[in-house]
Every structure is written in structure tokens, then in C-alpha cells.
């Protein structure tokens, strides 16, 4: 239950508990509301609920701005090329700006919010808040899925298995090509008896079996880079050449006080 989650986190970490908020989805959840005022109230309500349920003392929010590095990595198919965006509602930019101004959400060029919450995640002292399966299941620790309002606990083995399962399958949502005719059940079956340390080589060999050595290695590398969520400063430097600034967090109690000003 949410209450046991708070007790668990407080017991584990007596001092600072930082909620790392992947704020992209918040905009999509609220942009269909009748008025901007209702949408912004919805944003406040959702974030306050997150902070309360996770028992966070501090928070940091992140947004995606423009195209990330994965658009250049994708050679076989355009990254997220199958998404039908259409025209965004007129209140979309206002909600995004509100998240930056009111809640201090950060944007870093070339990186998705997914990457940013993951890079700053420190297992025992942070809680990732996101509805995104890749963010939740590629990171070890206790996370909060704010789309389903539920706690997700991910072990090291869970995270390794999820990553390699996704590399086998690809991700149709983001237009990422995997092995042909490999869905969740087939991927699970293929990895069933494979030890975690052997998974990279095993999956690479499956690509080589299907596409030949040269093509197989290229396709494997591309799919891996598109699926893999960056998790360290080294990852970020390698993929983008960017040196990340220090994490700035906001005090939850101070934010509550500001609401009365």
C-alpha cells in the first residue's frame, strides 16, 4: 500500500528522499482539459499526490525539449516515426512553461526526461516517478508509476532481463526494430535459461543468426542504443558529449509554503 511505501522509504533513508519526476506525461494527461486553469490544477494535484505517496522530502522534475540523440542513432527506421502527433492543443506550451516556472522542471538538450531521471537515480536515496515502462523497469530500486498510482520494485535481475527482452523485441511504440516475429512470450522463452552475464552475447548472436555478421552487429547495436536508457554521466558524455550539471532539488515543505504566498 502507499502507506507501507512511505514507511519503507523513511526507514531506509532517514534524511533526504528525492522524487525524480519524469514530467513529460503530465502534460499529455492534462492537455485535453477544458481550460488551462483546470489543467494546471490537475498538474499541481498529480505532483502533490506523488510527493505525498512517496514520502519525498525533496523533488526534481525533468522535461524533454526538441529531438534527443536517439534520432541520429536511428538508421533503419525514424525514431518515434510511427507516432501520430497531430496538432497539440493550444494550452500545451503553457502547461510545459508552468512545469518549468512553478515546479522548476529542467530541460537538457539532446536528452529525454527518461534519461535524466535515470542518470540522477541513486537507488536508496531517490524515487523515480514515471508511467514509462522503460524508465521503471530498466532502473533498480523502488519507483512510483504515477499513471497507475502504484509502487514498482525492480531488482538487478529484473532490470537486466527487461533490457535484453526489449532488445530482442524492439519497441513498436517508438518505432524501434527488433528481431522479426519476436514478441513478449517468445522473448521470455528465449531468455528463460540464459544467465544474466550471458545475455548480451546471447542476444547479439540471435541478431547475427537472423541478419548475418555485419548486418546483425549493426542492427543489434542500433536497437540497443535506442532501447537503453542512459544511467550515468559516462553514458551521457559518450552519447552526447554533454557534461551534466549538479542535480538541483527543491524542498517539498518550502513548495507547500509557497502555495500560500
Q: Which sequence ranges carry the predicted segments?
A:
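Short, Lys/Arg-enriched N-terminal segments with co-localized hydrophobic residues
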Residues: 1-12
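General helical secondary-structure elements
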Residues: 5, 71-73, 161
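Extended two-metal-dependent nuclease catalytic cores across DNA- and RNA-processing enzymes
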Residues: 10-11, 81-260
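Noncatalytic, basic helical substrate-engagement surface that gates or grips nucleic-acid strands
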Residues: 14-124, 129, 140-144
Amino acid at each position: 500500500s502507499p502507506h507501507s511505501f512511505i514507511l519503507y522509504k523513511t526507514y531506509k533513508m532517514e534524511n533526504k528522499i528525492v522524487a525524480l519526476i519524469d514530467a513529460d506525461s503530465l502534460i499529455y494527461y492534462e492537455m485535453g482539459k477544458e481550460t488551462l486553469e483546470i489543467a494546471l490544477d490537475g498538474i499541481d494535484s498529480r505532483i502533490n499526490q506523488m510527493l505525498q505517496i512517496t514520502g519525498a522530502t525533496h523533488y526534481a522534475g525533468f522535461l524533454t525539449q526538441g529531438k534527443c540523440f536517439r534520432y541520429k542513432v536511428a538508421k533503419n527506421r525514424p525514431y518515434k516515426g510511427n507516432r501520430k502527433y497531430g496538432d497539440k492543443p493550444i494550452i500545451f506550451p503553457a502547461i510545459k512553461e508552468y512545469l518549468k516556472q512553478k515546479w522548476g522542471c529542467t530541460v537538457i538538450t539532446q536528452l529525454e526526461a527518461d534519461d535524466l531521471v535515470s542518470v540522477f537515480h541513486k537507488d536508496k536515496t531517490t524515487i523515480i516517478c514515471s508511467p514509462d515502462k522503460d524508465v521503471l523497469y530498466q532502473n533498480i530500486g523502488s519507483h512510483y508509476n504515477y499513471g497507475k498510482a502504484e509502487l514498482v520494485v525492480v531488482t538487478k535481475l529484473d532490470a537486466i532481463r527487461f533490457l535484453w527482452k526489449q532488445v530482442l523485441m524492439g519497441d513498436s511504440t517508438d518505432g524501434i526494430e527488433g528481431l522479426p516475429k519476436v514478441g513478449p512470450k517468445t522473448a521470455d522463452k528465449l531468455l528463460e535459461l540464459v544467465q544474466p552475464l550471458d545475455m548480451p552475447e546471447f542476444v547479439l548472436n540471435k541478431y547475427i543468426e537472423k541478419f548475418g555478421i555485419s548486418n546483425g552487429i549493426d542492427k543489434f547495436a542500433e536497437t540497443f542504443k535506442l532501447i537503453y536508457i542512459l544511467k550515468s554521466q559516462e553514458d551521457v558524455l559518450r552519447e552526447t558529449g554533454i557534461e551534466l550539471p549538479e542535480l538541483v532539488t527543491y524542498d517539498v515543505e518550502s513548495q507547500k509554503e509557497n502555495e500560500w504566498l
